[in-house]
Amino acid sequence: MSSSVEITLRNMQFHVCIGVLPHEGQLPQPLAVDLTVWAAPAVDDRLAVDYRDLYRLAAGVLATPPLLYLETIAQTLLREAMAQPSVIGARVAVRKPHVMLPGPLDCAEIVVQDGVRL
């Protein structure tokens, strides 16, 4: 069994214009993002995954309009994370707390994963 390193950035906070309703594209809304990557253990610092790069990756995806669906954001971030050197698996969760539905709820959340399962 090969070993791996798990790196998680939990509850990153962004304010973005997201949604398909006309007013959603005008006013930034909060989104929370979790990004976990699994990587081969680094034998030296040059091969380590830098979590600052992971944060910049998430911020870049969320700064690229149009943002209509949580699913698209999650899939795009997953694809970008999996393209990073040394990354062998990734999991992304995107949460939108203010969802226009007829009943109360904490948030809408989309979770996508690719690669290793631990």
Mark where each language-model region is.
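N-terminal, polar/charged subdomain of small-to-medium soluble alpha/beta proteins
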Residues: 1-118
